[in-house]
């Protein structure tokens, strides 16, 4: 994205804005975390609807993983940390990872 400004003496100044890179948060399947907990995580951390959360949970269960959102780096890593913390606090081995898009 580029913005152009005109300085006081007629000089045009060009400012370029670099778009931040996007990162995908991926939820990983395991054999111990209850499906209801995964749905609750998707609703509370990723703001998914009940229907979206259930669809994603089944995708994780059937394929081993699913992308649950794309965010800038800081938000992606924060959400992944929130998932890991919630899982640990509830004694579940649920894992997630962050990958550059």
Swiss-Prot record:
Annotated source species: Treponema denticola (strain ATCC 35405 / DSM 14222 / CIP 103919 / JCM 8153 / KCTC 15104)
Subunit structure: Binds to the N-terminal domain of the chaperone ClpA.
HAMAP family xrefs: ClpS
Family from the record: Belongs to the ClpS family.
GO process annotations (BP): protein catabolic process; proteolysis
Function: Involved in the modulation of the specificity of the ClpAP-mediated ATP-dependent protein degradation.
SUPFAM superfamilies reported in the protein's UniProt record: ClpS-like (SSF54736)
GN (gene name): clpS
InterPro entries for the chain: ClpS, ClpS_core, Ribosomal_bL12_C/ClpS-like
Protein name: ATP-dependent Clp protease adapter protein ClpS
PANTHER family per record: ATP-DEPENDENT CLP PROTEASE ADAPTER PROTEIN CLPS, ATP-DEPENDENT CLP PROTEASE ADAPTER PROTEIN CLPS1, CHLOROPLASTIC
């Amino acid at each position: 994205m580029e913005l152009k400004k005109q300085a006081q003496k007629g000089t045009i100044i060009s400012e370029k804005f670099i778009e931040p890179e996007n990162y995908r948060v991926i939820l990983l399947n395991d054999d111990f975390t209850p499906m209801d907990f995964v749905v609750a995580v998707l609703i509370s951390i990723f703001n998914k609807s009940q229907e979206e959360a259930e669809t994603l949970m089944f995708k994780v269960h059937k394929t081993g993983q699913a992308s649950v959102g794309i965010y800038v780096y800081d938000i992606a890593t924060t959400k992944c940390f929130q998932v890991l913390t919630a899982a640990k606090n509830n004694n579940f081995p649920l894992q997630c990872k962050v990958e550059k898009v």
